[in-house]
């Protein structure tokens, strides 16, 4: 019988604040403000913010950038025992990468009602066909994360 996993939530808000700071960096470049950090053993091993426009790469979501950086940092494509903090609920592309990289837990801020696949448009991580289970939790600093996104799009609409 599997032992229940003990989850340390004591630094969730601290790591989400790091992700929010990265989201602000992306916003300053005109990117949709989403930031992500990947943590293993209490240390940040990967950071990223959305950069598909500036990087001419449609896959350059914050989660992708952070996971790629983390994999390089630890010289391993698998990241067991790690937690991904991201300011917006992951999409299907990012959720697939999260499973393939064996991330243990995802903590996100704001819901993504149109493309979020963790809870909003389906519960991807609970699907029986997956060979890896990912724990997930939403709403951590959700109001701040949502406000940053809302303000970004409000300002973008005002410019057009």
Where are the model-predicted features located?
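Short beta-strand scaffold segments in enzyme catalytic cores
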Residues: 34-42
């Amino acid at each position: 019988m599997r032992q229940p996993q003990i989850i340390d939530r004591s630094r969730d808000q601290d790591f989400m604040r790091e992700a929010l700071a990265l989201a602000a960096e992306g916003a300053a470049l005109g990117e949709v403000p989403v930031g992500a950090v990947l943590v293993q053993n209490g240390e940040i091993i990967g950071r990223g913010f959305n950069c598909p426009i500036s990087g001419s790469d449609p896959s350059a979501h914050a989660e992708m950038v952070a996971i790629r950086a983390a994999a390089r940092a630890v010289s391993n494509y698998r990241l067991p025992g790690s937690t991904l903090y991201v300011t917006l609920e992951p999409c299907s592309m990012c959720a697939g990468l999260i499973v393939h990289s064996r991330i243990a837990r995802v903590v996100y801020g704001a819901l993504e009602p149109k493309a979020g696949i963790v809870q909003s448009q389906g519960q991807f991580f609970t699907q029986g066909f997956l060979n890896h289970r990912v724990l997930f939790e939403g709403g951590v600093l959700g109001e701040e994360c949502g406000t940053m996104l809302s303000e970004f799009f409000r300002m973008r609409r005002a410019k057009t």
